[in-house]
């Protein structure tokens, strides 16, 4: 079992470590040629209406149906072979002739052709991360593609998303912003991180207007635009940071005497101080780049993580071990670049691949119970959505107490369509609970949350203490935080009496602006409240019933 829970590090021996400096300089020049989108590209871009709400950007660490690469390749053949072992590889080719050439190369290299498909479309470069579309859920249970103005003067690349959407059979939405995929990462809860070029390259718009478009088209209501700490020509977030999970982020680390050292340390401290969507501070992980190794420029593809490595081996192994520590249960695979297209500090594996979301995604939304919490009982909730319009069954909570034995499965109760609950009962003080949620549907899909399930479950400790007072502001009894997008208010409440409670939200004028009724346990319950339509400002949250009234002030 222990071996099953450990990530496996696999180094693929793929050619030389580096090109001569002159060749590296040429690659950088190719990537930045002309620097910005042409005026003709901007004029030709067709903006569409935004997707119907609710809109939610899909994170890289969620379920993927495939990965996009482009021929001629910027990645080694051994990487494609490894990708195609478990996942679908979609190769962009310019013609049937190119397709046949690639099939021959794949066959000769032992690539699993049953996991390969092709899109025939003209493109200008192999940086699929930068110009292919961004995926979002919309209209409750649909997956769509969001296009943008590619911020480089490559018209064929800029046109590609329409072919991508046609191939996938999904709706494409045109968001009239200059963007690039290497400068975008989202947590799946309404937050996105980008460097400052998200604003400076859209200088005709105010920052508020840029933020509004990100909200309308992607559901991003916390647009975290930061000054790029690398200070390089590219200004892409994937050159220094990466979301690994809703509560985990990887930040590049360099030696103390490196000119970027302080800026990167400041960035790590910035994220360590932020509250993630689960209500805890981010876990910040660091990968030391002793010689510009691009360790944050990795690809998460379902339960595997492909990390670019350049050597020396000891430094590579340290970086891979950081991933293994942060992502237990995932297979961590180190990949060396090809001799003709090596990994650079500002251009590596993530830049040259792009995950493709599952249009029939079985999505689980959950705000977990974490840390020390009052008991004796604990209630969790989850929303489960089938984007394939399939019948969902079963939805279960897998759990174990004090690390004893295997995880046990318990059916969750469907309280309303797509909304499920489960209560932990009979726990003792100091019991340590591990749990994850599992769902399946009749399309054959099965998902767990957290994504990896058993190797990295949610964990909480039962304190068996309930708050018996009814004094306003008892923080021990009532805690609330916004998801990163501030569209939902997550509430954790500890009570000494089980029963029906009314949860209400008041504005500063004393007007009730939102309300819901919940069955809560004697102990800790965690649930969420829709506050998407509420304006920024100060509110009072009230939980009352059964002779108990708990209140707290919150700022949106």
From Swiss-Prot:
<dbReference type="Pfam" id="PF04371">
    <property type="entry name" value="PAD_porph"/>
</dbReference>
<dbReference type="GO" id="GO:0005576">
    <property type="term" value="C:extracellular region"/>
</dbReference>
<feature type="propeptide">
    <location>
        <begin position="24"/>
        <end position="43"/>
    </location>
</feature>
<protein>
    <recommendedName>
        <fullName>Peptidylarginine deiminase</fullName>
        <ecNumber>3.5.3.-</ecNumber>
    </recommendedName>
</protein>
<feature type="signal peptide">
    <location>
        <begin position="1"/>
        <end position="23"/>
    </location>
</feature>
<keyword id="KW-0274">FAD</keyword>
<keyword id="KW-0285">Flavoprotein</keyword>
<dbReference type="GO" id="GO:0047632">
    <property type="term" value="F:agmatine deiminase activity"/>
</dbReference>
<dbReference type="GO" id="GO:0009446">
    <property type="term" value="P:putrescine biosynthetic process"/>
</dbReference>
<comment type="function">
    <text>Deiminates the guanidino group of C-terminal arginine residues on a variety of peptides, including the vasoregulatory peptide-hormone bradykinin, to yield ammonia and a citrulline residue. May promote the growth of the pathogen in the periodontal pocket by producing ammonia, ammonia having a protective effect during acidic cleaning cycles in the mouth.</text>
</comment>
<feature type="active site" description="Amidino-cysteine intermediate">
    <location>
        <position position="351"/>
    </location>
</feature>
<keyword id="KW-0378">Hydrolase</keyword>
<dbReference type="GO" id="GO:0004668">
    <property type="term" value="F:protein-arginine deiminase activity"/>
</dbReference>
<dbReference type="InterPro" id="IPR007466">
    <property type="entry name" value="Peptidyl-Arg-deiminase_porph"/>
</dbReference>
<comment type="similarity">
    <text>Belongs to the agmatine deiminase family.</text>
</comment>
<keyword id="KW-0288">FMN</keyword>
<keyword id="KW-0732">Signal</keyword>
<keyword id="KW-0964">Secreted</keyword>
